[in-house]
């Protein structure tokens, strides 16, 4: 059985899919198909798998390949050193996880010189073996035979100590012992966090974790990442371990056979193995494992927030006046055409003298009239509410909405290579205002130009695995761009680069071809683009739109490979494809089963019919502006009990942040998202969603605003429900175990580590 077959069967079982589904999907991926293409245009082959399922297959396949690569490297290393027995080879080939594989390899891994190594060099391994067998003999008499002053083994105590070091290493490297200890950590380890002495004032933002204990199995991802950040900043010290007594008792049951003198030597070695070797090793693993899990959860939150933001409702092709507000430096103002082209830029001053305000009124009214502007976009940063009030006082027609736009990342874009390339002759402030206006017109087209991490919808995004984050966010952007589709004759290079099958180089070639030869008149013309071969065309064509093309299907998501099916439908009804798209009565006469083939099944035919009814339909919802409450412009204006409109700016594992128009987002804790119990905030709210909230509490000193979405919330109730310090686990787990009378405080790992860290701080 080949590795590929093994992979397919493993994935099939893990994801509860048929072997045929997994096999077809992996084959398509290996042939260069993208996730959006497979999910959209190969439904018959995959059995209607969606993007999530296809992505899971792809990622799991990669993990299994990497596992086998590591397995092969280990087998090669052992074979080259003549250490590979048939039994060991069999165990390695059966290992299903990386941790199991590494456990098996650990005793044979080239290692630095250890206490056990030194003991072996002193000839103490036979003594260790004899002790480990735990027979009935005088251990001190046996140890006398191994006294060797030349090797610094000057008495029986040193001989026995060296033998115990060897036994301790055997125990710590035993694959079964490691796995059992690993499972103990996963089920019963406590996360213990304390503040370093003298760091209390500096670390006030971490004060909830100054003396914090919680089961590892229950700690939320955001809390673990917060504690780790505090540790990185030198404020906190974090440890993860179960009660030492339980861990050592389990090991003793496995390794100590009796209470003989030899058995007592083994018991001592086992305890040393756990404290000095196995415990710290598994703790390191658990830190990495829990961090990876927390990263995955944080990345999932970020990815879902990004998806909602990218798929936010577009204003559409309407000429816009965009403003990047400011006080001293004024408001950077730009007029944009319906296609987002910069028509004019200026600076207006709204918070200065009356003369300057009147000059601003004149400028704005001239711009609106001259360029027939149809909407006002205001960045939601500094001076945004004052700017909004200024425009409301102009009493513009109701057909011209005044919209607050989230400007997170606009400054990043304005300094980017893409912005410099497009607006080389304009400064950063003009570029930023343009980005704000375009973000209102089409959030997706504009946000793809910005590093997703700069958009401000993540949770500890700078603390998580950056490669995993980039991989996940790229998947989300790719998914969103292809879900909406791209107008090939107006799209930016950045937007085109996310189209299935293209990438940066082909996107650049398309723009270059468009600039040199004019707009594309058909999808078929894409084949003339340099280096855009048959595979790239297959993967991309269905997601690229050409408005007003001679063939109306070029403006739809019907793939060119299925044009003949639509032509056959039209031919059978003796009409044109255009007639078929315009006349629902004609479409009702189509009998889909007549057009089924081996490659074209009902899923594809159903998609085609939907496209004929609404060609190139935009899946994004209708645009609807949000107006903040007048007179509420800064945190000081907020009072408990106020009911306000707002917009969700970020969703996290512990709640949602909401902009109510005071330049500082408020938090709706998970316990206040609904009158019913909420397990996952993402089930209740989405980024860019419009909500109504009640102000619960305003802490100006800590810059915290507590909000509620409950119908009748208790004011001030968040002070106890939203802080982790008030949710410590009850019972024995609320604090580290007290040391026994014969157990010195210094023997506790945590106390030792804390003391060591504090000494390091003082140096």
Q: Where do the PLM segments sit?
A:
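C-terminal accessory/binding modules appended to enzymatic or scaffolding proteins
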Residues: 16-17, 313-315, 478-512, 630-668, ...
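Duplex nucleic acid-engaging cores and interfaces of nucleic-acid transaction enzymes
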Residues: 53-56, 63, 67-77, 81-322, ...
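A glycine-rich phosphate-binding loop feature that marks nucleotide/adenosyl-phosphate handling sites
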Residues: 183-190, 323-327, 381-386, 405-412, ...
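Low-complexity, acidic/Ser/Thr- and charged residue-rich accessory regions of DNA metabolism proteins
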Residues: 145-156, 213, 229, 248-274, ...
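Long, charge-rich intrinsically disordered scaffolds of nucleic-acid metabolism proteins
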Residues: 100, 104, 403, 409, ...
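Short beta-alpha junctions and helix-cap segments that line functional grooves
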Residues: 320-322, 332, 388-391, 522-525, ...
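Accessory alpha-helical DNA-binding modules that contact the DNA backbone or grooves
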Residues: 34-35, 46, 50-150, 483-622, ...
């Amino acid at each position: 059985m080949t590795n590929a077959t093994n992979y397919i069967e493993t994935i099939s079982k893990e994801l509860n899919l048929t072997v045929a589904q997994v096999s077809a999907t992996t084959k398509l991926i290996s042939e260069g198909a993208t996730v959006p293409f497979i999910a959209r245009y190969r439904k018959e082959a995959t059995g209607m798998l969606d993007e999530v399922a296809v992505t899971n297959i792809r990622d799991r396949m990669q993990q299994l390949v990497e596992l086998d690569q590591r397995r092969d490297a280990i087998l090669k290393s052992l074979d080259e050193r003549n250490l590979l027995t048939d039994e060991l080879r069999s165990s390695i080939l059966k290992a299903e996880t990386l941790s199991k594989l590494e456990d098996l390899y650990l005793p044979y891994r080239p290692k630095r010189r250890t206490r056990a190594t030194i003991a072996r060099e002193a000839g103490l391994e036979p003594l260790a073996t004899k002790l480990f067998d735990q027979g009935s003999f005088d251990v001190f008499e046996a140890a006398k035979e191994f006294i060797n002053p030349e090797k610094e083994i000057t008495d029986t105590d040193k001989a026995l100590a060296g033998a115990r070091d060897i036994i301790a290493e055997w125990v710590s490297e035993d694959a079964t012992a490691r796995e059992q200890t690993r499972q103990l950590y996963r089920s019963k380890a406590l996360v213990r966090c304390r503040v370093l002495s003298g760091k209390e004032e500096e670390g006030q933002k971490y004060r909830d974790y100054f003396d914090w204990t919680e089961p590892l199995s229950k700690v939320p991802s955001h809390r673990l990442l917060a504690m780790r950040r505090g540790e990185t900043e030198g404020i906190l010290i974090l440890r993860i371990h179960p009660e030492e007594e339980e861990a050592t008792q389990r090991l003793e049951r496995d390794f100590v056979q009796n209470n003989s003198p030899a058995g007592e030597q083994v018991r001592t070695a086992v305890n040393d193995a756990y404290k000095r070797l196995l415990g710290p090793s598994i703790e390191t693993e658990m830190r990495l494992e829990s961090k990876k899990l927390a990263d995955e959860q944080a990345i999932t939150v970020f990815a879902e927030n990004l998806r909602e933001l990218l798929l936010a409702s577009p204003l559409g092709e309407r000429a816009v006046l965009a403003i990047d507000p400011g006080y001293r430096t004024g408001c950077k103002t730009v007029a944009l055409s319906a296609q987002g082209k910069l028509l004019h830029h200026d600076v207006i001053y709204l918070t200065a003298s009356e003369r300057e305000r009147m000059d601003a009124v004149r400028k704005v009214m001239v711009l609106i009239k001259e360029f027939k502007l149809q909407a006002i976009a205001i960045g939601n940063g500094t001076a945004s509410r004052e700017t909004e009030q200024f425009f409301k006082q102009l009493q513009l027609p109701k057909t011209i909405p005044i919209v607050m736009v989230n400007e997170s990342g606009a400054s990043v874009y304005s300094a980017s290579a893409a912005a410099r390339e497009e607006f080389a002759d304009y400064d950063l402030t003009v570029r930023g205002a343009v980005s704000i206006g375009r973000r209102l017109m089409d959030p997706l087209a504009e946000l793809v130009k910005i590093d997703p991490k700069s958009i401000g919808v993540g949770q500890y995004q700078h603390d998580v695995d950056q490669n995993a984050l980039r991989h996940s966010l790229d998947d989300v952007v790719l998914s969103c761009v292809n879900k909406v589709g791209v107008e090939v004759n107006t799209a930016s290079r950045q937007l085109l680069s996310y189209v299935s099958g293209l990438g940066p180089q082909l996107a650049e070639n398309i723009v270059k071809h468009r600039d040199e030869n004019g707009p594309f008149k058909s999808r078929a013309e894409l084949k003339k683009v340099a280096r855009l071969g048959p595979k790239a065309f297959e993967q991309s064509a269905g997601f690229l739109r050409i408005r007003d093309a001679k063939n109306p299907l070029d403006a739809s998501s019907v793939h060119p490979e299925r044009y003949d099916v639509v032509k056959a439908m039209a031919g059978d009804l003796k009409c044109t494809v255009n007639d078929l798209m315009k006349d629902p009565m004609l479409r009702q006469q189509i009998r889909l089963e007549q057009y089924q083939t081996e490659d074209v099944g009902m899923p594809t035919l159903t998609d085609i019919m939907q496209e004929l009814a609404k060609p190139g339909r935009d899946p994004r919802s209708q645009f609807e502006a949000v107006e903040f409450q007048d007179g509420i412009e800064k945190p000081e204006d907020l009072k408990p009990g106020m009911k306000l409109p707002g917009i969700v700016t970020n969703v996290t594992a512990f709640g949602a942040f909401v902009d109510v128009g005071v330049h500082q987002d408020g938090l709706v804790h998970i316990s206040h998202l609904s009158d019913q119990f909420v397990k996952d905030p993402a089930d209740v709210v989405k980024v860019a969603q419009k909500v109504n909230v009640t102000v619960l509490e305003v802490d100006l000193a800590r810059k915290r605003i507590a909000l509620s979405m409950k119908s009748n919330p208790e004011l001030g109730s968040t002070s106890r429900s939203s802080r982790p310090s008030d949710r410590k686990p009850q019972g024995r787990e609320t604090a580290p175990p007290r040391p026994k009378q014969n157990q010195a405080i210094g023997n506790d790992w945590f106390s030792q580590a804390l003391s060591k860290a504090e000494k390091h701080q003082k140096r």
